[in-house]
């Protein structure tokens, strides 16, 4: 696709933050995992600000519906060209574009830790989630999980609460 990439190694920054946090709290696995997406967000915005650019979002309708994103991490962006597409639709689009098989066949992963995949972490397949989003129908156990995840993550999609006293 000839897209320019640059790499910033945030490993030492993450390690330093985790070390600093030891003096104030004991980090849960979820809190620890969400540091990386938030560091990526601050890095993307720093580069964008320095170069007069905007940050592109990579989240999709499937992830947004169940809240499978880090608030103020990978959920932060200035624009998002794929926000209204499900994972299924994104893969269809990639096939249409002629994307390499290694991209299409790779299991979706937020990269939160080694060996992590979205579906294993969610306990839900994108096929079931997307069927629900596109048709309103899916396996009953999957539907129950989808509805619970959607309700539990409403705070991620809602506007910031403000005091109007």
Spans of features found by a protein language model:
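ATP/NTP-dependent adenylation/nucleotidyl-transfer catalytic domains that generate, transfer
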Residues: 1-54, 58-165
